[in-house]
Amino acid sequence: MEPLGYQQRREPMKVEQNFEVVYDFSNLCAAYRAARKGKRWKDAVAKVESNALEAVTVLQKELSEGTYKPGNYHEFYVFEPKKRLIQTNSIKDKIVQHAFCDNILYPVLSRPFILDNYGSQVGKGTHFGLDRLRDFMREYYRKHGSADGWVLKADVRHYFASIRHDILKRDVNRLLTDPRSQALSDAIIDSTPGNVGIPIGNQSSQVYALLYLNELDHFVKEVLHVRYYGRYMDDFYLISEDKEALREAWRKIEQLLAPRGLELNQKTQIFPLRNGLDFLGFHTYLTDTGKVIRKVRRSSKDRMRRKLRKYAVMYENGAMTRKQIEESYQSWRAHASHGQCRSLITKYDAVCASIFERSVTSNHAAEDQQPSCPGKGQRYEHQILRRPHRICDR
């Protein structure tokens, strides 16, 4: 079903692009460096790195002649924050995806995105989305003078696994104009068996997933005229003073998603704005005085506490280094610092620091001379070590 003739009213933005940029040697070298980042310890990456020049040259020939075909995927599960199937491709395919996504796919497909589509984009991301939610709440309070209002909070059930190949290829090829770009995109989409589902681990899948719900974004903003709307991948919210309007929006959104093979999660609900909403790792709520409060979600706090307990045991056994623990904790700490979480951070700083204050084996004697996780009043500092580049690094 096409609500209100929406699809017929919108015309795609055409952008000319030159496929040669994908197999340009310097771009392939840049893609190779991006693909190996953080993975140089893996055997498959080390094998390519030992003869990177030849690997890049072969890829350049395959792409220029149109003979490149994506390989098979390696599958595994992750369990945080929930169980998900991850499908990752080979280093060769990662190089192609970086070259294609960075030079053509993302620049072209992102052009029709609305401002409040936050996921996996340059200049956006989780903290941008959180700041937009904060600004929406402040604006709502200025307009209505209270925190009385309603929130429709929703996400799509099994989003990546439900994306239909035929609809996705149609959406992509309305924007890509070079037949070679269209052919490569189609090959990547069809590299997974069947006609439904794209792999979470692919760089291209992030761009495709952003585009697949672009129609929803414009429908909510331009047809339903909901100003206070934001989406991060398949997780989105609508804020309104009218509960019945949100119920009607819920119904129309389900009608819009059904032909695309999507359905909303059973946890989708409408609740009072003053209760606050969970979005992007924080619980954000609007007070009766118009102040916006942002706290780390309880699940995030519990997950970090469990990790620190696990790290303490692993450090005692020599299975984890101080640097590894500090890097993991610093990532969570930087995230938590975007909320009103000073006392929580101080508490967890002390827990992290206590790991290194316990009796440890002689393996850690040298490490214990280095600065540990910050305690109360201390500033967390972290140095980034750079490795020397080799082939294709210039």
Q: Model features per residue range: what roles?
A:
Residues 5, 9, 15-19, 103-161:
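Active-site-proximal segment of RNA-dependent polymerases
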